């Protein structure tokens, strides 16, 4: 099972090595605006799932939202510590 920290480490490694075929690398290459649109899309899907589709589907959408948030963190140079100090 992945944790927030292990996912961030995995995505950071893919970004640093520019791993061929990586969706993360592709998303980072498309830039902040594209990543932001993905975050908004997944946030909306999370809300709809919570309203109408149950806990399992909501958790799935939340995991996708977390993924795109972490890609944005990498894009903007934001660390886990930056997030933790603001919780």
Curated annotation (Swiss-Prot):
Gene3D superfamilies: MazG-like (1.10.287.1080). Keywords: Amino-acid biosynthesis, ATP-binding, Cytoplasm, Histidine biosynthesis, Hydrolase, Nucleotide-binding. It comes from the Bacteria. Coiled coil: none annotated. One of its GO terms (cellular component) is cytoplasm. It holds the Pfam family PRA-PH. It is found in: Cytoplasm. GO terms for molecular function: ATP binding; phosphoribosyl-ATP diphosphatase activity. InterPro entries: HisE (IPR008179), PRib-ATP_PPHydrolase-like (IPR021130). It catalyses: 1-(5-phospho-beta-D-ribosyl)-ATP + H2O = 1-(5-phospho-beta-D-ribosyl)-5'-AMP + diphosphate + H(+). NCBIfam families: histidine_hisI, PRK00400.1-1. Belongs to the PRA-PH family. This is Phosphoribosyl-ATP pyrophosphatase. The lineage of its organism: Bacteria, Bacillati, Actinomycetota, Actinomycetes, Bifidobacteriales.
């Amino acid at each position: 099972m992945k944790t927030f920290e292990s996912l961030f480490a995995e995505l950071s490694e893919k970004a640093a090595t520019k791993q061929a075929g990586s969706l993360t690398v592709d998303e980072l290459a498309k830039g902040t605006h594209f990543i932001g649109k993905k975050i908004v899309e997944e946030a909306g899907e999370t809300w709809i799932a919570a309203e109408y589709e149950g806990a399992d589907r909501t958790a799935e959408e939340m995991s996708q939202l977390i993924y795109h948030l972490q890609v944005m963190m990498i894009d903007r140079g934001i660390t886990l510590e930056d997030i933790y100090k603001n919780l």
